Amino acid sequence: MQSTIVNLLQRGAGHAPAIFAPDREPLRYGMFREHVTGVVAALNGCGLGRNDRVAIVLPNGPHMATAFVSIATGATAAPLNPSYRAEEFRFFLEDLNARALVLMADSESPARAVAAEQNIPVIELEPNKNVAGLFELHSQRAVSSGSNASIVADDTALILHTSGTTSRPKIVPLSHGNLVASSRHIGETLALSADDCCLNIMPLFHIHGLLAALLASLAAGGSVVCTPGFNALKFFAWMAAFKPSWYTAVPTMHQAILTRAPRNRGT
């Protein structure tokens, strides 16, 4: 069995939904697989390939989810907190030695100016307005030629940083094999199946949201509702609209949900 992130998508039936989002049609597995292939080709066209580090600064939601999977399949994904200030982006982009930065086409993030300072090409993501997670990539500038070789299990899929609470944040590289094994283990532990739907309220620049919510669901052939992020006021409306079978969160979120629950009894 292949142990790369893109192979997780093979579990889902072509017509089955993979990604849901408010106010959009679901992205189905067959289309998701085609989309990943197209994004990898677009990255290669920009001169990006295997093990090239691509920083991602996108808001939480379906496009962040599909961008992570697609970019990790063709290069190395390095998601960053979109709320960072310029000085934080300056540190992380330099520390990553990023070969490109992916931003929403209309983004006014300070990461754009920092990328210009560091001579990092910006690739703009133009979202599809109808289907959750579909997008096109546009770049005004090519990167020097990268490797178009196929990704293997030992290649780095994801780069995160430690919190840096006691010292300088350190790079944590995670391989395809590591992420695939962990996501399958989570799925087996939770007995996830293709019938399960996860309501994701976790940020997708942290391992919790990327692994426990997104990849574990895809590994089971299930679906994920990609919300803009945690909002206790909207949580029960999302539950009613999408009828997920499970969600995952940190203790402070659980507490906020429990506090709000009595007002939403019966919804």
Question: What are the residue ranges of the model-derived segments?
Answer:
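Conserved pre-ATP/AMP-binding loop-to-beta segment of ANL
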Residues: 129, 142-161, 167-168, 191-197
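Short hydrophobic alpha-helices that are characteristic scaffold elements of the AMP-binding
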Residues: 69-75, 95, 206, 215-219
